[in-house]
């Protein structure tokens, strides 16, 4: 749960062994400690759906990542054109039933959990355990279990990388910012991030993206000018020393992120590759972005001598020859 905090709060852990019943572990109840060692340190895969945040919590609360994971959203993307299928859609596809959604927005940090919440949480993992063999069978039929293992290994690798600081260009409305706006936006974004992390607050409770963008577009050149747009008791003033230092520094505006520029010839090759990827994805019955994103293709066309994920793993079998032929 991340509704009221900067760091996600673990509200409940649900597990279900194949053929067994669900077990609910309450991390907010000291008498019912989560068996992290059993969950994280065994050879059987931990099955998740859209599990990036689950993995973040495992690392944060359990101190480690599982040895092996199997993300069912990734697995279904490898055997269908649906890049990000929802849990409910997955259950409906394999089991032909509509899972209960009544407790999705429930307050999972409130205690005690009611019977409806506990039943909902148990069904959540029991249905996942039931559909998992069907997904495995479909991937085995398509000879794509190795693809799934590769994509899940990449998911674990991404979780071990340092988290990138929140940057101005991730703000809602960032594309409309001009150079002078971007300097102020970056300063305010950094100050907001520092305060949110220090006090474990959601960014939006300190300052919404919309408010931040509006102030940045005024381009206050100094801290004194910024004070015209922030109330005296605004929480961002808790970062006064940092704000003072950053406004006093004569730093140029951050550059606008841009995609590589392609020559006329490279542009033609890029367009051919996009068409090839789209056609190949249709043949494989997967989403084109799973095979190769536009960004990855463009970077490859701009610098074909550089290493690329398109030249490794299961993608290489479908892309390497075409990439080398065109470029």
Q: Which positions does each model-derived feature cover?
A:
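Short, surface-exposed recognition loops or helix-turn segments adjacent to catalytic cores
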Residues: 70-73, 102-111, 141-151
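Conserved short loop/turn motifs at secondary-structure junctions
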Residues: 74-78, 109, 210-214
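Accessory DNA-binding and partner-docking regions appended to nucleic-acid-acting proteins
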Residues: 115, 131-327
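Conserved RNase H-like, two-metal-ion catalytic cores of nucleic-acid enzymes
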Residues: 1-89, 93
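A short, charged helix-loop
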Residues: 89-116
